[in-house]
Amino acid sequence: MKLRANRVGEQMKKELGDIISRKIKDPRIGFVTVTDVQVSGDLQIAKVYISVLGDEEQKENTLKGLAKAKGFIRSEIGQRIRLRKTPEITFEFDESIGYGHRIDTLLHEINKDGKREE
């Protein structure tokens, strides 16, 4: 069953990216990238991880806009993917990109300090 949940998650990720970028006209929603979709084993719940280009205020506004459009997004997913029941969608920020950027910055600082000591 886990394999099917992964396949549904990947398909939802592709469709959500298209729906958010082309179908939703809410001005609160900025530049959003769907980074991952985790679907439960029974295909009832889908956690959608997103990254947003912008500051904290823009991220919060985007999350509010997506929450407002959740019903529309779910109905679009239901039309595009044939499932008995369309999963309930929740949106969360993907902090891994920020962590990766922070680690990259720290590694560059360490590298600079190492060259100065030589």
Swiss-Prot record:
InterPro entries: KH_dom-like_a/b, RbfA, RbfA_dom_sf, Ribosome-bd_factorA_CS
Chief place of localization: cytoplasm
GO molecular function, one term: ribosomal small subunit binding
Pfam families named in the record: RBFA
Gene3D superfamilies in UniProt: 3.30.300.20
A GO BP entry: ribosome biogenesis
GO CC terms, sorted: cytosol
Keywords: Cytoplasm, Ribosome biogenesis
UniProt-annotated location(s): Cytoplasm
Assigned protein family: Belongs to the RbfA family.
Assembly behavior: Monomer. Binds 30S ribosomal subunits, but not 50S ribosomal subunits or 70S ribosomes.
Job description of the protein: One of several proteins that assist in the late maturation steps of the functional core of the 30S ribosomal subunit. Associates with free 30S ribosomal subunits (but not with 30S subunits that are part of 70S ribosomes or polysomes). Required for efficient processing of 16S rRNA. May interact with the 5'-terminal helix region of 16S rRNA.
PANTHER family found in the cross-reference section: RIBOSOME-BINDING FACTOR A, CHLOROPLASTIC-RELATED
HAMAP family referenced in this protein's UniProt entry, alphabetically: RbfA (MF_00003)
Protein name: Ribosome-binding factor A
Higher taxonomy: Bacteria, Bacillati, Bacillota, Bacilli, Bacillales
